[in-house]
Amino acid sequence: MDLITTTAELASVCARLANYPVVTVDTEFLRETTYYPLLCVVQMASPDEAVVVDALAEGIDLKPFFDLMSNERVLKVFHAARQDIEIVWHQAGIIPHPIFDTQVAAMVLGYGDSIAYDALVERVNGHRPDKTHRFTDWSRRPLTKDQLEYAVADVTHLRDVFAALDADLKKRGRGDWVSEEMEVLTSPKTYDFHPERAWERLKTRVRKPKDLAVMMEVAAWREQEAQSRNIPRSRVLKDDAVGDIAIHAPATPERLATLRSLPKGFEKSQWGADIVAAVQRGLARDPRELPKIEKPRNNTNGAATVELLKVLLRMTSERHAVASKVIATVDDLERIAADDAADVGALRGWRRELFGEAALALKHGQLALAIEKGRVVRVERS
């Protein structure tokens, strides 16, 4: 195992790795106090070598690494790739491609919902890796021997995991299922956090166009502020405060001061003035230009349908040995219960064939569920 600290060393190792069809990759980073993750360490391995790159080494240029990430001839294997890809996207403006995410593959093969890396390694080769340094401060220097051994183990074990999952996918004919998921993971839309769409990630739900307009403006302001200062969104304004502001629409500092979700005196700060301005912009928006607010889907009949769909989903998951989470979410089920043409993953591609068609049949009485010998079974109805 080599520790790479110079651009020349990195260029040399990336040139060697580019000759292999598959390279395993992992990153270590910090983001507790920043909006954008701080890349600290990069680990890579081929069948013949493994390296750790000090991404914070003085003078190092990571361009050779980024070039390898965009090399179409090399498959990059990650576990839970989203945050690793986000880092590369932010620092270099590229999306690693092609990629293979072992966590997604494991879900497709029935290893459970979002299985952790150490648990997956243990399932594959019987050895549970040491995760002592999982929460270490990777920005501190020098890196210790234990840290380096921990870091390199992540990509060496990943070689075995990939080989096992890839073989199983081919045996069961599910390679295309994983490829479909990789298209989502490698789409720039997944990582392009435009401030005007920040409201979509909030769990707060509003029912009035006015509330939605205010929430959109306040969430966009918060996103811009967090990005420009490189601090977490919650350091600017917590999610519950955004929802509170959306509902009460405080268009003056005095009204803002009445909200309990904000600290005392907040209305006198520059951020307080910015929020009041955002509220005023929201109130001035034309309701006809706003996204359509979804009607609540929690009526009695709809709720009963969702519960039946949950049973069908569990049956499908067990029958085909696929994690239920990768087939459909609860939100998918609620949308299907409300609309046959819902734009959800469960009604597209392999998911529709595996589950979606049966879900619609169950909803319309063409399929029933019954209990036989203590087990729930599907009953086709004419």
Curated annotation (Swiss-Prot):
Keywords: Cytoplasm, Exonuclease, Hydrolase, Nuclease, tRNA processing. Belongs to the RNase D family. Its main location: cytoplasm. Residues 208-289 form the HRDC domain. One of its GO terms (molecular function) is ribonuclease D activity. The keyword Cytoplasm applies. It is an enzyme of class 3 (hydrolase). SUPFAM superfamilies: HRDC-like (SSF47819), Ribonuclease H-like (SSF53098). Exonuclease involved in the 3' processing of various precursor tRNAs. Initiates hydrolysis at the 3'-terminus of an RNA molecule and releases 5'-mononucleotides. GO terms for cellular component: cytoplasm. GO terms for biological process: tRNA 3'-end processing. It comes from the Bacteria. Residues 4-169 form the 3'-5' exonuclease domain. Its cofactor is a divalent metal cation. HAMAP family: RNase_D. PROSITE patterns: HRDC. It comes from Nitrobacter hamburgensis (strain DSM 10229 / NCIMB 13809 / X14). It catalyses: Exonucleolytic cleavage that removes extra residues from the 3'-terminus of tRNA to produce 5'-mononucleotides. Its EC number is 3.1.13.5. It is found in: Cytoplasm. This is Ribonuclease D.
